[in-house]
């Protein structure tokens, strides 16, 4: 990487470690000054993944857990570019996603709320970015779900993202939301992000990405660091 393009991480664009409206952050967020850790060689190493490390259907959540039919719900295409602070593509980096199903339930032992599981949907996928830094997923639009943070609390439709970027020390975990979701105004996880940076977590509907008579398309670019970096998940 050309050091002339490096910029400081914009901490003012990220959620605070402790946000009063978000109960879990109050319980687990640090309350004492942070201690800087000296960067180690292992933090600077580039994670290497090849196509042989991924399954042919890892990017297609509508088929990678299929048992006896297609999963229920609205099919969507989610695509975008992973960029560094200079706007250059981050190539061959691993992008992982996980999400609830169309009914708003995760395949996880701790998710026991009253919504059905889909036997044909796992809710997890991964892919590598191409030479333009682009990733591509086919999935089902996730449903909203109750989460008990406050009375009548519901999480907006969202997809979790994990990216390693150019080295292990640059890993980013964030969430992607959908345009026009009325629950965004009431969600303390989304609202905990500074207002000027919230739009960076909302995908844009794209008719160009939409596949006719099959799936709606959403574009979601991710910037790993710098002045326009995508806010991280706390």
Whereabouts are the PLM-identified features?
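Beta-strand-dominated extracellular/periplasmic modules and repeats
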Residues: 1-234
């Amino acid at each position: 990487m050309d050091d002339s393009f490096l910029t400081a991480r914009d901490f003012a664009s990220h959620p605070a470690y402790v946000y009063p409206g978000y109960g879990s952050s109050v319980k687990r967020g640090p309350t004492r000054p942070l201690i800087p850790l000296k960067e180690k060689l292992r933090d600077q190493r580039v994670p290497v993944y090849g196509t042989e490390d991924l399954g042919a259907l890892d990017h297609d959540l509508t088929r990678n857990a299929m048992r006896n039919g297609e999963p229920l719900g609205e099919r969507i295409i989610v695509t975008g570019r992973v960029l560094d602070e200079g706007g250059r593509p981050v190539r061959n980096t691993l992008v992982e996603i996980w999400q609830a199903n169309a009914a708003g339930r995760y395949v996880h032992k701790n998710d026991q709320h009253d919504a059905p599981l889909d036997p044909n949907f796992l809710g997890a996928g991964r892919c590598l970015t191409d030479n333009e830094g682009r990733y591509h997923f086919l999935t089902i639009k996730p449903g909203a779900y109750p989460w008990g943070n406050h009375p009548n609390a519901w999480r907006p439709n969202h997809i979790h993202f994990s990216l390693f970027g150019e080295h292990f020390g640059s890993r980013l975990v964030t969430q992607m939301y959908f345009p026009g979701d009325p629950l965004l105004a009431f969600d303390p996880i989304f609202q905990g992000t500074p207002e000027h940076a919230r739009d960076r977590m909302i995908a844009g509907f794209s008719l160009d990405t939409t596949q006719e008579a099959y799936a709606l398309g959403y574009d979601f670019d991710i910037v790993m660091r710098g002045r326009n970096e995508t806010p991280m998940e706390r």
